Design a protein with these regions (language model features):
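Catalytic core of pol beta-like nucleotidyltransferases
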Residues: 1-16, 25-30, 41-94
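A structural signal for short, well-ordered beta-strand segments
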Residues: 19, 34-36
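P-loop (Walker A) phosphate-binding loop of NTP-binding proteins
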Residues: 22
Length: 94
């Protein structure tokens, strides 16, 4: 799964991506979604349609529901948990 995610983000305006939640902890069930925290490359604007396309394409590639969250937009109650769980799955080469 992490290789599919990394390969996909190589073609997207993403600088870094982390897996968090149940998949990061190895506690996923058949009902779990894939939680991804991303740092976008804002050198060019990322609109709603591009964001929605990434979300849809990730779901298609993984065959799972995906929760795609931009870094800095997690709700306050989820920040500590996400930071504890998160595992880097992609970082753009410099």
């Amino acid at each position: 799964m992490t290789q599919i995610i990394a390969d996909y983000f190589k073609t997207q305006p993403v600088l870094k991506a982390w897996l968090f939640g149940s998949y990061a902890r190895g506690e996923q069930t058949s009902d779990s979604d894939v939680d991804l925290l991303v740092e976008f490359d804002h050198s060019s604007p990322i609109g709603l349609f591009a964001y929605a396309r990434m979300w849809r394409e990730l779901q298609e590639r993984l065959g799972l529901n995906v929760d795609l969250v931009e870094e800095g937009t997690l709700r306050p109650f989820a920040v500590d948990s996400a930071n504890r769980d998160k595992k880097l799955v992609y970082e753009r080469a410099s």
